């Protein structure tokens, strides 16, 4: 029996997403009997090798679910990795006596993790999507003399100094006054009571995550808060956010892992912490 889980490289999609998908699709599915045997070994004996086999056999389902969230401008590899986190949480909590297959139980946890990732990052992506908007995003703060809205003279002066149209300055200023909406409860909470009903995270076909975020958006903060928050991050965290969400070609977790010589999981943690700090400063 194995009680220390060995690294599972298949959980982290690399630069070649097609190869990853091919790899996980080649892993055999478990029969009901095999699944129950493994589930009992994990549930009653804490056999982590059984957990590893259960996770590997269900990675293909994460890929399938992640594809349905491809319309938010987020890297597919990142959606898959977040879904894999949800899968591992589901395996950890799966009780073989529940009378359902693991895939039926895990789908809620997979979607929960993906939903949290989308709601954590979607607005940051949408704030600056064009080259001009990205330029404004990082420079508008330094161009402003006060916290109130820019007047027409200031708008034209900023536009001229940055080489953009006045309307783009107004548009970016408007975007930066919004705040991000937190998702509650957090998908990584350890409190079992927060997950008494995983169905709470099921998709509501009347509203997708982006629509929920837009409906909950409000405009009572200053653009200065966002820029000051960015300036308050350490250089690496700031670079990760810029490369992931504001660069012309968004970097993947794998790209940044190679750049900083750390694991993709470490980059994901740094990104999550940076986002959390950014929100905390904005909402303070």
Curated annotation (Swiss-Prot):
Motif range (Interaction with polymerase core subunit RpoC): 78-81
- List the GO terms this entry assigns under cellular component, sorted alphabetically: cytoplasm
GO BP annotations listed? DNA-templated transcription initiation; response to heat
Q: Which keywords belong to this entry?
A: Cytoplasm, DNA-binding, Sigma factor, Stress response, Transcription, Transcription regulation
| One GO molecular-function entry | DNA binding
Question: Mind listing where the DNA-binding region sits, in residue ranges?
Answer: 253-272
The domain of life is Bacteria
Q: Where in the cell is it found?
A: Cytoplasm
Pfam families in UniProt = Sigma70_r1_2 (PF00140), Sigma70_r2 (PF04542), Sigma70_r4 (PF04545)
Q: Which NCBIfam families match?
A: PRK06596.1, rpoH_proteo, sigma70-ECF
Q: To which protein family does this belong? A: Belongs to the sigma-70 factor family. RpoH subfamily.
State how it assembles: Interacts with the RNA polymerase core enzyme.
- Any idea what this protein is called? RNA polymerase sigma factor RpoH
């Amino acid at each position: 029996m194995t009680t220390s889980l060995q690294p599972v490289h298949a959980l982290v999609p690399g630069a070649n997403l097609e190869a990853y998908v091919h790899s996980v699709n080649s892993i055999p599915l478990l029969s009901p009997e095999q699944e129950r045997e493994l589930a009992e070994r994990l549930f009653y004996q804490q056999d982590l090798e059984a957990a590893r086999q259960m996770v590997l056999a269900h990675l293909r389902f994460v890929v399938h679910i992640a594809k349905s969230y491809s319309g938010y401008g987020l890297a597919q590899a990142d959606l898959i990795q977040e879904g894999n986190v949800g899968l591992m949480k589901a395996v950890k909590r799966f009780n073989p006596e529940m009378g359902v297959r693991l895939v039926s139980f895990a789908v809620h946890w997979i979607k929960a993790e993906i939903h949290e990732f989308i709601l954590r990052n979607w607005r940051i992506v949408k704030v600056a999507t064009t080259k001009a908007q990205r330029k404004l995003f990082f420079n508008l703060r330094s161009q402003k003399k006060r916290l109130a809205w820019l007047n027409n003279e200031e708008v034209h002066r900023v536009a001229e100094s940055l080489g953009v149209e006045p309307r783009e300055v107004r548009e970016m200023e408007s975007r930066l006054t919004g705040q991000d909406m937190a998702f509650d409860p957090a998908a990584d909470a350890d409190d079992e009571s927060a997950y008494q009903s995983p169905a709470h995270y099921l998709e509501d076909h009347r509203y997708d995550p982006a629509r929920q975020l837009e409906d909950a958006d409000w405009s009572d903060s200053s653009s200065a808060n966002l820029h000051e928050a960015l300036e308050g991050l350490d250089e690496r965290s700031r670079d990760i956010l810029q490369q992931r969400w504001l660069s012309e070609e968004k970097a993947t977790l794998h790209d940044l892992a190679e750049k900083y010589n750390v694991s993709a999981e470490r980059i994901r943690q740094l990104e999550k912490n940076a986002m959390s700090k950014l929100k905390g400063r904005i909402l303070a």
